[in-house]
């Protein structure tokens, strides 16, 4: 079996310096790992992504892809965990557009990375704890971490109509989409819209609202009232069970866990169906595509989808019963995989195309304008083709996506005294979702043996999704380092968490190896003395 090391492995902070982060364009067969070692991608590999298994043609310039038989793994890893040591997620800078750090010398000290990354997870914690609801920013400490309205640059009060915006622009956009909106600019349609002059031209203000991504359908699911209504729809059985437990002095966590265990697989699948986030719209870049315009559209889309992903995770039964830190760490570990498996599901009925959004559909060759992304497009198309061959059903997809979230981290989540309880809760959740997937497959009417084979085939593809996710993360970090595209707030937090996690993994790995070497040296000295 051929051994192939990833060209962009993460071994130290210096590997993300701009001078070293260029991902080469490869035109040979693309490899899929059969095992992962930490965050360095040292794995044995086998040919998987080649034109022989793709449902689209490859241009003649890549004819060297056609050689070699397709070999499948005999023992692929299923739901392989991410690297162990996850470290703190970054918080925001004071601008809505957060640009990458300036270039640094590759000879910089390894410890300097810890000074470039903030040490808390304020945005993700705020959203998970339910404070993503529109609320004004009042305290001086809160203003340091505030979002800014992309229309007028005032402080944003919340997430309105698909973007972070201030109360003034939110109200203006609401009036415009509900009533009179045939505004006319008295000048040249290029008026400056800022905090002081936002009322000077309604036409240019509305145009800028649309340019930054405000959409009519992007409001209802973010509103507090929506969540209140959803909570009021709880079944009478659950309310009765909770009230009875309180009268008897029972513990709420145990009762909520009991409620989860009483959910049938069918009810759990229906809950996952209701939790599905809405489609996110993003404007297609103008032709011809450039590296900057393509990456700008993709990062804007990812940032919007991350907001919806948090709401989706909180609606999975039992997820909010985990500690806030555990919720943060699980999302940090799997966000790219969740985005990519969602992309594959949207693209499953469109061979040769990637449906990033309803208004952003890309062909394989359209990725040529972005250095290093063509390889990722090929891997996405190949894995989507495999899901298409399996005739992946929507309910199966819902269960698989939830399993990616719940199985995304195998290292100790909570503190030492809470580790056993946290692990038990997470295992209980994962078992419930796995049972739901088994139930969905059994409902298809195939034989027991075919059910087992189908379950194995679906789970085996998750290691491919993990591999593509790692490649996508490395590519995005490279684009950020080269200042090709600005990286937005929540997306920046996730990227910084990934970078710091890989840095600490490499440091801990080197420390372990040095300790082991010293122990071996001591042992050899003792043997010689004897």
Curated annotation (Swiss-Prot):
Gene name, Swiss-Prot/TrEMBL: Esr2
Name of protein: Estrogen receptor beta
Free-text description of this protein's post-translational modifications in UniProt: Phosphorylation at Ser-87 and Ser-105 recruits NCOA1.
Keyword Thylakoid: no
Biased composition (Low complexity): 506-515
CDD domains for the chain: NR_DBD_ER, NR_LBD_ER
GO molecular function terms noted in the UniProt entry: DNA binding; DNA-binding transcription activator activity, RNA polymerase II-specific; enzyme binding; estradiol binding; estrogen response element binding; heterocyclic compound binding; hormone binding; nuclear estrogen receptor activity
UniProt entry tagged with the keyword Glycoprotein: yes
Ranges for region Disordered: 506-530
Cross-referenced Pfam families: ERbeta_N (PF12497), Hormone_recep (PF00104), zf-C4 (PF00105)
């Amino acid at each position: 079996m051929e051994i192939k090391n990833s060209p962009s492995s993460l071994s130290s902070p210096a590997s993300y310096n701009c001078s070293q982060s260029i991902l080469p364009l490869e035109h040979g067969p693309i490899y899929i790992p059969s095992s992962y070692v930490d965050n360095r991608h040292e794995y044995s590999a086998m040919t998987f992504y080649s034109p022989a298994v793709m449902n689209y043609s490859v241009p003649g310039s890549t004819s060297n892809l056609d050689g070699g038989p397709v070999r499948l793994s005999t023992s692929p890893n299923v739901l392989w965990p991410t690297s162990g040591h996850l470290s703190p997620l970054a918080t925001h800078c004071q601008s809505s557009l957060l640009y990458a750090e300036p270039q640094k010398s590759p000879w910089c000290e390894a410890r300097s990375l810890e000074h470039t990354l903030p040490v808390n997870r304020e945005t993700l914690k705020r959203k998970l704890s339910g404070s993503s609801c529109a609320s004004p920013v009042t305290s001086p400490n809160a203003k340091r971490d505030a979002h800014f309205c992309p229309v007028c640059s005032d402080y944003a009060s919340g997430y309105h109509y698909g973007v972070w915006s201030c109360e003034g622009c939110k109200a203006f956009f609401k009036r415009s989409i509900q009533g009179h909106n045939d505004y006319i600019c008295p000048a040249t349609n290029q008026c400056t819209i800022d905090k002081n002059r936002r009322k000077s031209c309604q036409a240019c203000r509305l145009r800028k609202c649309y340019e930054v991504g405000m959409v009519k359908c992007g409001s209802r699911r973010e509103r507090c009232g929506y969540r209140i209504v959803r909570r009021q729809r709880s079944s009478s059985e659950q309310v009765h069970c909770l009230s009875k437990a309180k009268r008897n002095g029972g513990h709420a966590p145990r009762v909520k866990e009991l409620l989860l265990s009483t959910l049938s697989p069918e009810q759990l699948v229906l809950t996952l169906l209701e939790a599905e986030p809405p489609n996110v719209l993003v404007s297609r870049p103008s032709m011809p595509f450039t590296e900057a315009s393509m990456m700008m559209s993709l990062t804007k889309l990812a940032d919007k989808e991350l907001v919806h992903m948090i709401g989706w995770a909180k609606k999975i039964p039992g997820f909010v019963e985990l500690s806030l830190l555990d919720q943060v760490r699980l999302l940090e570990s799997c966000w790219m995989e969740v985005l990519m498996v969602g992309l594959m599901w949207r693209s499953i009925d469109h061979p040769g195309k990637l449906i990033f959004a309803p208004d952003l559909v890309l062909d394989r060759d359209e990725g040529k304008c972005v250095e290093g992304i063509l390889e990722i497009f090929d891997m996405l198309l190949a894995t989507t083709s495999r899901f298409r061959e399996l005739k992946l059903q929507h309910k199966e997809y819902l269960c698989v996506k939830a399993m990616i979230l719940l199985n995304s981290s195998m290292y100790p989540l909570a503190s030492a005294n809470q580790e056993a309880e946290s692990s038990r809760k997470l295992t209980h959740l994962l078992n419930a979702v796995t049972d739901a997937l088994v139930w969905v497959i059994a409902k298809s009417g195939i034989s027991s043996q075919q059910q087992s084979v189908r379950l194995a085939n679906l789970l085996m593809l998750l290691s491919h999704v993990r591999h593509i996710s790692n490649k996508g993360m490395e590519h995005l970090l490279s684009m950020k380092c080269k200042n090709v595209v600005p990286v937005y707030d929540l997306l920046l937090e996730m990227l910084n968490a990934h970078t710091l996690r890989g840095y600490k993994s490499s440091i801990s790995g080197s420390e372990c190896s040095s300790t082991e070497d010293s122990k071996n040296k001591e042992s050899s000295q003792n043997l010689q003395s004897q």
